[in-house]
A protein has these predicted regions:
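Hydrophobic core
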Residues: 9, 13-17
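Short amphipathic alpha-helical segments at helix boundaries and their inter-helical linkers
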Residues: 105-107, 196, 200, 296-313, ...
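Secondary-structure end/capping motifs
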Residues: 246-331
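Positively charged n-region of N-terminal signal peptides that target proteins for export
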Residues: 1-9
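Bacterial lipoprotein signal-peptidase II cleavage site
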Residues: 18-30
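Pocket-lining segment of extracytoplasmic ligand-binding domains
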Residues: 106, 112-113, 183, 189-282
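Short, glycine-/small- and polar/acidic-enriched structural segments
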Residues: 29-186, 193, 200-206, 221-222, ...
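Conserved C-terminal helix/tail region of periplasmic/extracytoplasmic solute-binding proteins
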Residues: 317-359
Length: 359
């Protein structure tokens, strides 16, 4: 019996040792394998936040000046581009350019007349805004035709679209500025002069032109931009100082990108909404703002982008320059590429409408 117990104990010990041997092999430290790189959990669609910037913008007190930039602000498009706007009101384009030259503002809006200063090198166009129809030549009670302007006192604002429409109107009937008594006045003073009868006629843009037509008894619209649409064009643009366009390119591309989105929204039949924003900013009644919606052909950002690609936009500025030369406001031809930043508009448009944006 003792021998049997000893044999059984020996067998148990053998199996126990075997089990320990298996356990040792299972827990042995394996040869280190090549380290796998950690999986990248970063969202490929996430972009580095844009550095916040504040842009000082000069505008005029009308729907046309504000329709796109105010929409871009109200709809959050400027915020998307990291931009905070500081808006300042000015009487006209030349005054806005002077403010830019002094450093008071970064970007400004101009009507047709002030484009001659861009062609002269004083400013560079960073975006086409729209094709205007807000300028008009208006006669008082005793002036009912363009021919009646001869010998009359006519108020206008020199260096602005007011001067352009007046020159076109006079030339269309064989007259020049020498055939009238031309009175260079501030736009608000022109309205007052028409109301008091101190001048016989005037050349103005909206909304002042609408005010004269509504409040001056016997007033007659003698001509507007559409009168000469087959031979001329009236453009409105956004501008900046040439040296800054080169040195601070990113700021202007970001601004134009947001502006194009504002144009897309506004031009898509959102006139009532835009008019409310304009009325609130200018502290005018809604109807006054809404009535200005017919002052232009409102271009979308996509239309401007496509127009640059096919040469249409360059053609607009070339025609405008031809009119400057023929009217004596520009001495000689200047390549439009010298003062229109097509590349800024193209880069902004590429991000919104180009192949990369479609992917």
């Amino acid at each position: 019996m003792k021998k049997l117990l000893a044999l059984m104990l020996a067998l148990v010990m053998v199996f126990a040792l075997a089990a320990c041997g298996d356990s040792g092999e299972a827990t042995a430290t394996p040869t280190p394998a090549a380290t796998e790189p950690a999986a990248d959990t970063t969202d490929p669609s996430a972009e580095t936040p844009l550095e916040p910037i504040t842009i000082k913008v000069g505008y005029m007190n009308n729907y046309g000046s504000l329709w796109s930039v105010l929409t871009a602000e109200q709809m959050g498009y400027m915020e998307e581009m990291g931009i905070t706007l500081e808006l300042s009101s000015f009487a006209d384009g030349p005054t806005i350019i002077s403010a830019m030259e002094s450093g008071s503002i970064d970007i400004g809006y101009i009507g047709d007349g002030a484009h001659k200063l861009c062609a002269a090198g004083n400013a560079e166009i960073i975006a086409l805004s729209h094709i205007s129809n807000g300028d008009a030549v208006i006669g008082g009670p005793n002036v009912t035709t363009l021919e009646d302007l001869a010998g009359k006192t006519v108020a206008y604002a020199a260096g602005t679209s007011s001067e352009v429409i007046l020159t076109n109107a006079l030339n269309s009937v064989g007259l020049t500025m020498d055939d009238i008594t031309a009175m260079n006045m501030d736009p608000s003073a022109i309205v007052t002069a028409m109301l008091t009868g101190d001048v016989d006629a005037c050349a103005l843009w909206s909304p002042e032109s609408l005010t004269v037509l509504e409040q001056v008894e016997g007033a007659t619209k003698l001509a507007d931009n559409m009168t000469f649409s087959d031979t001329s064009i009236s453009l409105a643009s956004w501008i900046a100082m040439p040296d800054r366009v080169e040195s601070e390119r990113d700021m202007f591309v970001r601004f134009v990108t947001a502006l194009f989105k504002g144009m897309d929204y506004s031009a898509d039949e959102h006139y009532d909404e835009v008019a409310e924003w304009v009325a609130d900013l200018l502290a005018i009644d809604y109807e006054s703002a809404y009535n200005q919606r017919g002052d232009a052909e409102w271009l979308s950002g996509k239309e401007v982008y496509d127009g640059i690609a096919d040469g249409t936009v360059a053609g607009y500025y070339e025609l405008q320059q031809e009119l400057m030369i023929s009217s004596g406001n520009l001495e000689s031809e200047v390549p439009v590429e010298d003062y229109v930043a097509f590349d800024i508009m193209t880069e902004a448009g590429d991000a919104l409408y180009g192949e990369a944006a479609a992917e």
